[in-house]
């Protein structure tokens, strides 16, 4: 069994971990990097794995630094389920389309300003359509229900009163 830290290792944003066994590949969170321009640029890099090879995503909560790259993941080939609690799923249904609007607005503003100064145009990280399509992957899992993926890989969402 291998656990790879893909984000939130040298920074507090971009939470994402890849759990791999011979039988399964699970992504734990798929968060957006936030902060300086250099940190945010990490969102535009290719994933360090093939999204089509991921069997499922376990989403711990709906903060954008934990779920913000799920639309990009799905657009880039992920076909599996995103496991999340009801509350997390409901919040992600608000957060991800809102994030897409922000991505589109930021790109439009950058490109309008950049046209005058000669900057290279940028594209939004993902679109509203990408965010909406990603939400179709969500599968609600009740708190305290064990998800069994293989004989050796199981997960349970516990209720946290400290952090959403």
Locate predicted features.
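Pre-active-site segment of Zn-dependent metallo-hydrolases
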Residues: 22-80, 84-88, 95-133
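Extreme N-terminal starter segment of soluble prokaryotic enzymes
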Residues: 1-2
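Conserved small/polar residues in nucleotide/adenosyl-binding loops
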Residues: 162-164
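Feature recognizes metal-dependent phosphohydrolase scaffolds
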Residues: 5-7
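Short acidic-hydrophobic, aromatic-tinged amphipathic segments that line or gate anion-handling sites
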Residues: 139-143
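Short beta-strand scaffold segments in enzyme catalytic cores
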Residues: 14-19
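Short strand-coil-strand connectors
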Residues: 20-22, 149-151
